[in-house]
């Protein structure tokens, strides 16, 4: 088969335009079908046609979960972590039109871990000497930039990590020069207000997500635990508490 022979998508059957082919392990995928895959999915080249078809079915079912998602808490700016604490669900998205973006809706109980990753990059600052050459300072001086990422580890058939940046722009810091030639000063980014702001935000997101994850798991464990019959203090009946912890006969609260 030649380089410019006609190719067709093995998922939807449509003809694939020039430069529109996305290779699969055993076939071809058009860019429109590829666009529907989860944004957290990175194993397309190692996936079979059937595996991609199953994921697209999952993604279509996900639209229904997005429709009924009720946001109870929003964490972050730009890319946001959205919680539906009543249903024990969450999503991560930067989209303004959530229905159109169709972000993956996951159970909080499927979170296996959450960390804050602070990424540092440095660039040496140079100056011109008397001959017009760019040379290092003595001691060398650097400009630093920082980005703050939340990494959420999850149980999901199509991806196991969601990594997103919580600062819209890199935090850039240029430490002041040393007042003593040849002596390098210790630099602490924690003294920078913007750095502290995003580090605190990242820690807050991490702590809240772990807390609501633990709460969701506790609810699941309680619901699965065998119920013990008790005597209702309101109607006197021997009853097994319902899902709300109430008497199955009179509706009186038995727990709380």
For each of these PLM feature ranges, what is it?
Residues 3-23:
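Short recognition patches in nucleic-acid-associated and regulatory proteins
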Residues 13-17, 29, 34-37, 239, ...:
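Cys/His-rich microdomains that often coordinate metals
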Residues 86-135:
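Phosphoinositide-binding peripheral membrane targeting modules
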């Amino acid at each position: 088969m030649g380089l410019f022979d006609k190719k067709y998508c093995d998922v939807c059957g449509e003809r694939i335009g020039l430069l529109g082919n996305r290779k699969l392990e055993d076939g071809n995928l058009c860019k429109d079908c590829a666009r529907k895959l989860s944004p957290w999915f990175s194993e397309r080249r190692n996936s079979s046609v059937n595996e991609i078809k199953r994921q697209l079915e999952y993604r279509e079912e996900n639209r229904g979960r997005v429709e009924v998602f009720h946001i109870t808490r929003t964490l972050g700016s730009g890319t946001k972590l959205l919680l539906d604490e009543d249903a024990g669900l969450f999503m991560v998205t930067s989209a303004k039109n959530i229905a159109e973006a169709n972000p993956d809706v996951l159970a909080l109980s499927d979170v296996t871990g959450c960390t804050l990753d602070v990424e540092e990059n440095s660039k040496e600052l140079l100056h011109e000497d008397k001959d017009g050459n760019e040379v290092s300072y003595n001691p060398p001086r650097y400009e630093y930039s920082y980005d703050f990422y939340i990494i959420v580890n999850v149980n999901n058939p199509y991806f196991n990590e969601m990594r997103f940046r919580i600062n819209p722009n890199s935090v850039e810091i240029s430490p002041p020069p040393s007042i003593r030639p040849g002596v390098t000063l210790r630099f602490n980014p924690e003294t920078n207000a913007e750095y502290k702001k995003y580090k605190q935000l990242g820690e807050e997101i991490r702590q809240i997500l772990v807390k609501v994850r633990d709460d969701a798991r506790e609810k699941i464990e309680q619901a699965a635990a065998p119920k013990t019959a008790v005597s209702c203090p309101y109607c006197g009946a021997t009853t097994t508490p319902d899902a709300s912890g109430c008497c199955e006969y009179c509706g009186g609260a038995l727990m709380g």
